[in-house]
Amino acid sequence: MRRCSLIATIVELVTAVIEPAITAPFELVDVEYGKIGSDYVLSVFVDKPEGITVNDTADLTDIISPLLDTIKPDPFPEQYFLEVTSPGLERPLKTKEQVEAAVGQYIHVGLYKSLDKQKVFEGTLLQFKEDVLTLEYMDKTRKKEIDIPYSLVSKARLAVKF
């Protein structure tokens, strides 16, 4: 099995097993698995409206860790570290619902192919309707608006405006 295929399978399996156990007020934002330095790390990103505390991550680790042990056969090729953490200020926007919730916020969008000779945009998400993001961004010193089809978005996340 190819490495990226194995990682995708692990992420899908883990998500399917832990998602039902992460209940309100918590939200499962993302699951990532990969090598950091010489160690494999399974990162589980969670959030809640008022933000995640250290105690929240400890409690969620106690819920998630035993669930991972129930996955048979064991999908992990090596020992790994489990990291339960907040998505941070630049949280990923991986679903249409997450993009919809980000309307009015400053975001970073990467595209599969160029639009107006650009593959990356940062700006305020004005609206998300009918699978189109309307983004207001700065082009040098001028404000511009662009409509980006959701199907062109390779990656989107909240961004910090400087």
From Swiss-Prot:
Localisation: Cytoplasm
Family statement: Belongs to the RimP family.
GO biological process: ribosomal small subunit assembly; translation
Predominant cellular place of this UniProt entry's protein: cytoplasm
The keyword Cytoplasm is assigned to this record: yes
HAMAP family the record matches: RimP
Signal peptide: none
CDD domains the UniProt entry points to: YlxS_C (cd01734)
Source organism, top-level taxon: Bacteria
Function: Required for maturation of 30S ribosomal subunits.
Name the UniProt record assigns to this protein: Ribosome maturation factor RimP
Transmembrane segments: none
InterPro entries hit by this protein: Ribosome_maturation_RimP, RimP_C, RimP_C_sf, RimP_N, RimP_N_sf
Keywords recorded for this protein, A-Z: Cytoplasm, Ribosome biogenesis
GO CC annotations on file: cytosol
Gene symbol of the encoding locus: rimP
Segments forming a coiled coil: none
